[in-house]
Amino acid sequence: METLFSGIQPSGIPTIGNYIGALKQFVDVQNDYDCYFCIVDQHAITMPQDRLKLRKQTRQLAAIYLASGIDPDKATLFIQSEVPAHVQAGWMLTTIASVGELERMTQYKDKAQKAVEGIPAGLLTYPPLMAADIVLYNTNIVPVGDDQKQHIELTRNLVDRFNSRYNDVLVKPEIRMPKVGGRVMSLQDPTRKMSKSDDNAKNFISLLDEPNVAAKKIKSAVTDSDGIIKFDRDNKPGITNLISIYAGLTDMPIKDIEAKYEGEGYGKFKGDLAEIVKAFLVEFQEKYESFYNSDKLDDILDQGRDKAHKASFKTVKKMEKAMGLGRKR
């Protein structure tokens, strides 16, 4: 069975877009791959974080994974900082990366421009740590969006460099892009991806939004003026985005949605979608609360940590041996 790895930062509550584009798809593939789902809190601290808020959001994200349908008997859910091999392997890969290629990373450039008090070194060395996250588990498949594709390409380059310089120790991962329709956009500006860090709360629906508030956001979402329910990302981005949300939450094919609402106006469609979103959030949040406030969540994270540690320790030891680190025993 091939291995799939995915990491999400606990830097905010995931949106309904994160659910449709990632979490829901993870549930679908956990029967087909040996899945490792990592809460990458060490990546989060490359930017300033409040320690209490970070811990809370880490636990919230773990509960959200489980509420989404991740089965701890099929997949490994764990927290990055609880598995020491990540920073160990991250440092080893940092030593074979060049400053030039790290400075070319688009996310580094974007975040460095926003840095108020100097550029944290962790921003620059973020990609080798991300590469370590992936290679530690002999990962074959990494599901990512366009914004992370450049980092995975760098990971593949670092794997080639390590294997060429030392030994064929590391597995070279393949990129898997989200399926068509899996990308959910901003509700008020459907030319931009929906983001949990957006300053305008009307642009996104958090998985922990109050359901009635979320329904209002759907009803006030931007559309066009012709009133035709048709999937056309180039010419009708607003209604196309709402159709994507409808399809993502109901599993109804886009063509069937178009046929169902043929001759109907946007008011009817938005009203129905608002109720679908509301019902989804009510059920989702009930599951979330049952995990967040339970000892079972800690048991699952302990189990995931132990499995991840066992698997990653083997890879780190192979890397250390290949590089000549430590004593020969």
UniProtKB/Swiss-Prot annotation:
Using the chain's own numbering, where are the disulfide bonds? none
* A GO MF term: ATP binding
Q: What are the UniProt keywords, alphabetically?
A: Aminoacyl-tRNA synthetase, ATP-binding, Cytoplasm, Ligase, Nucleotide-binding, Protein biosynthesis
* Chain positions recorded as ATP binding sites: Q9, P10, S11, G17, N18, G145, D146, D147, V184, K193, M194, S195, K196, S197
Q: Which Pfam families is this protein grouped with?
A: tRNA-synt_1b (PF00579)
InterPro entries found in the cross-reference section: aa-tRNA-synth_I_CS, aa-tRNA-synth_Ic, Rossmann-like_a/b/a_fold, Trp-tRNA-ligase, Trp-tRNA-ligase_bac-type, Trp-tRNA_synthetase
Oligomeric state and interaction partners are given as: Homodimer.
The entry sums up its family as follows: Belongs to the class-I aminoacyl-tRNA synthetase family.
Function description: Catalyzes the attachment of tryptophan to tRNA(Trp).
Q: What is this protein called?
A: Tryptophan--tRNA ligase
Q: Which organism is it from?
A: Staphylococcus aureus (strain MRSA252)
Query: Highest lineage ranks of the organism?
Result: Bacteria, Bacillati, Bacillota, Bacilli, Bacillales
